[in-house]
């Protein structure tokens, strides 16, 4: 029978000093036999997805204590990728994921906590906490702050739904008046919550449902709705139950590594492909698998992407639907239900609130389940009032969207495409693979051949795009922006948004060893591995080279001979210490970022630390 971890610091004569300190935090005699549960919050006033989380920790804590546990809250950092975008701040975004994972490990292990409730929301916070959960392998439940309501603006008498990306695109479109741009800017992000499309934050929060580590609705109930409060309350009660099952009943099936098995990773990736999730999810799933000790690789992602159809299209792929519309259509359980009917989901994987995923789908899929309470839950609607206050409204849609032929969520027979929303491409320019969000690519350019326009920084590429130096048929190559080369693997949202605003969204491609925002659409291919700074062939591309892209056949090819490529590689290696570095880029790299770059792996490994370097130093 496992012993409560917290007994290390709460029991025995030698722990009198530790108990004195625990007492100073408010613990009483009767608390020292109870599980100590870490409430891992991420409140910050810098990020709209987190501004409303200040009171959420105590909301969960009260439920934990009412159920017989002791709750202790701490906060992690949280970076807003949208605010950090387009300047040196973006260098810090991806490294913050690993810093969050480390900080959770430090706090939980230093204080011997028995379990965790992770209150996450935005881009790097959910994956950072997921990595920590797998690393620590103690009972955990995730509950997110929830998605933002979609913005609404009236242009030329027509009400248009919009989001952050619309503001970025219109800002670079000089045909848009300043007055119209001001309206869009003020309306795009109306409430607290994670940005309203299927961007990285919402994608990751949806995936926690498929992993079995969060409750139904975690990814889709808007932050402003009163129903989300119940998710926090249930999480507080359920984590105490999981603690008792593990520590008092020796039930190891409730541990994260028992839940997030290879089959669970396959389920999560299947959902990701079906819902057209952000390409960043690939990075984070691979990183989480490494922490979980699960052999899940780009090859698995490639296999899944070939067999799973795209069942859901949400902004930025379309302006018709946002996350609030996915919820109305049955949420993630609705998508999983369609995947289940298509035989594409493993029903037997356990989760934190039901016997297994199959039981959860049977209970929560609105197509097969006619329970009034379930249907009412998925009718939770946006309030339509700008606010930073959580649970501030209880509006409901009049009816659900259960049209699986023409609705937001489709069945397999009526899929948006029988090809999934993500694809892995391989070729001589990316031997270890690269990623494209096919759900955001017009099918007319799934096969594309163009001339390389080579840039060694995102800034240089943006300058060329806005300077009208990029023309139809170009392939914009942005290199030395990978995990090592950036460092930090910047998101390329501005270049893709500006290509779209210049009318080149369907006329050009973009290839990078960096990554893309979940808000990116168009023929945007990222995560080229190995990256340029790690000796990848993307570092050998020359201006004017022909690049061939073939999504249906999962191929990307630099059209030069093997001999020519070998000569270029030899010439690069001959540069010695100057090899595999950007030639003309001025960028100040702090010691903190240098430390990250020193051990970062390429994107095909999740951009995690190369632990072999640590092992070699033992």
Curated annotation (Swiss-Prot):
Pathway noted in the entry: Amino-acid biosynthesis; L-isoleucine biosynthesis; L-isoleucine from 2-oxobutanoate: step 3/4; Amino-acid biosynthesis; L-valine biosynthesis; L-valine from pyruvate: step 3/4
Cofactor needs: [2Fe-2S] cluster; Mg(2+)
UniProt catalytic activity: (2R)-2,3-dihydroxy-3-methylbutanoate = 3-methyl-2-oxobutanoate + H2O; (2R,3R)-2,3-dihydroxy-3-methylpentanoate = (S)-3-methyl-2-oxopentanoate + H2O
GO molecular function annotations of the record: 2 iron, 2 sulfur cluster binding; dihydroxy-acid dehydratase activity; magnesium ion binding
Residues found modified as N6-carboxylysine: 124
Magnesium is among the record's keywords: yes
Free-text remark on how the cofactor is bound: Binds 1 [2Fe-2S] cluster per subunit. This cluster acts as a Lewis acid cofactor.
Protein keywords: 2Fe-2S, Amino-acid biosynthesis, Branched-chain amino acid biosynthesis, Iron, Iron-sulfur, Lyase, Magnesium, Metal-binding
Ligand binding (Mg(2+)): 81, 123-124, 491
PROSITE patterns xref list: ILVD_EDD_1, ILVD_EDD_2
EC category name: lyase
Assembly, per entry: Homodimer.
Family: Belongs to the IlvD/Edd family.
Main function: Functions in the biosynthesis of branched-chain amino acids. Catalyzes the dehydration of (2R,3R)-2,3-dihydroxy-3-methylpentanoate (2,3-dihydroxy-3-methylvalerate) into 2-oxo-3-methylpentanoate (2-oxo-3-methylvalerate) and of (2R)-2,3-dihydroxy-3-methylbutanoate (2,3-dihydroxyisovalerate) into 2-oxo-3-methylbutanoate (2-oxoisovalerate), the penultimate precursor to L-isoleucine and L-valine, respectively.
Protein name (database record): Dihydroxy-acid dehydratase
Gene: ilvD
């Amino acid at each position: 029978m496992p012993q409560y971890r917290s007994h290390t610091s709460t029991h025995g004569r030698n722990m009198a000093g530790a108990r004195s300190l625990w007492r100073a935090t408010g613990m009483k005699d009767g608390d020292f036999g109870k599980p100590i549960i870490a409430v891992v919050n991420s409140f910050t006033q810098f990020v709209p997805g987190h501004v409303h989380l200040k009171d959420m920790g105590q909301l969960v804590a009260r439920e934990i204590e009412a159920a017989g546990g002791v709750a202790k809250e701490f906060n992690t950092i949280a970076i807003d990728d949208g605010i950090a975008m387009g300047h040196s701040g973006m260098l810090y975004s991806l490294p913050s994921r690993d810093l969050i994972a480390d900080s959770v490990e430090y706090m939980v292990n230093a204080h011997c906590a028995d379990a965790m409730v992770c209150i996450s929301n935005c881009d790097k916070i959910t994956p950072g906490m997921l990595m920590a959960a797998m690393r620590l392998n103690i009972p955990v439940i995730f509950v997110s702050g929830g998605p933002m309501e979609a913005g609404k603006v009236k242009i030329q008498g027509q009400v248009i739904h919009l989001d952050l990306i619309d503001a970025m695109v219109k800002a670079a479109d000089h045909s848009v008046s300043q007055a119209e741009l001001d309206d869009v800017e003020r309306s795009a992000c109306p409430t607290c919550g994670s940005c309203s499309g299927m961007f990285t934050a919402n994608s990751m929060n949806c995936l926690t449902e498929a992993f079995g580590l969060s409750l139904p609705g975690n990814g889709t109930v808007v932050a402003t709705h009163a129903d989300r409060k119940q998710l926090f309350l249930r999480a507080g009660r359920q984590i105490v139950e999981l603690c008792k099952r593990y520590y008092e009943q020796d039930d190891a099936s409730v541990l994260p590594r028992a839940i997030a098995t290879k089959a669970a990773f396959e389920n999560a990736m299947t959902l990701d492909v079906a819902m057209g999730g952000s390409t960043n999810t690939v990075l984070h799933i691979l990183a989480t698998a490494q922490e979980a000790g699960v052999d899940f690789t780009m090859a698995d992602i490639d296999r899944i992407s070939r067999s799973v159809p795209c069942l859901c299209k949400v902004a930025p792929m379309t302006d018709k639907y946002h996350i609030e519309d996915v919820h109305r259509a049955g949420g993630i359980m609705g998508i999983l239900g369609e995947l289940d009917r298509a035989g594409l989901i493993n029903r037997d994987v356990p989760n934190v609130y039901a016997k297994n995923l199959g039981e959860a789908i049977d209970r929560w899929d609105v197509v097969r389940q006619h329970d009034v309470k379930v249907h009412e839950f998925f009718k939770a609607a946006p309030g339509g009032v700008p606010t930073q206050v959580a649970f501030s409204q209880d509006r409901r849609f009049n009816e659900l969207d259960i049209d699986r032929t023409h609705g937001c969520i489709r069945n397999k027979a009526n899929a948006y495409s029988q090809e999934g929303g993500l694809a892995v491409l391989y070729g001589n320019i990316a031997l270890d693979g690269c990623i494209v969000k096919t759900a955001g690519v017009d099918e007319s350019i799934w096969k594309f051949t163009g001339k390389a326009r080579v840039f060694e920084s995102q800034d240089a590429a943006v300058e060329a795009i806005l300077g009208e130096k990029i023309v139809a048929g170009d392939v914009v190559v942005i290199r030395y922006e990978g995990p090592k080369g950036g460092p930090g693997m910047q998101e390329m949202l501005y270049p893709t948004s500006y290509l779209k605003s210049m009318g080149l969204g369907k006329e050009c491609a973009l290839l990078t060893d960096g990554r893309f925002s979940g808000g990116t659409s168009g023929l945007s291919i990222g995560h080229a591995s190995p990256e340029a700074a790690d000796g990848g062939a993307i570092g050998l591309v020359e201006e004017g080279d022909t690049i061939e892209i073939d999504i249906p056949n999962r191929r990307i090819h630099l059209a030069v001979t093997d001999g020519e490529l070998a000569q270029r590689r030899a010439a690069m290696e001959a540069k010695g210490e100057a090899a595999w570095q950007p030639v003309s880029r001025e960028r100040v790299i702090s010691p903190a970022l240098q430390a990250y770059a020193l051990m970062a792996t390429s994107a095909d490994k999740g951009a995690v630390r190369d632990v072999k370097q640590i092992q070699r130093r033992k």
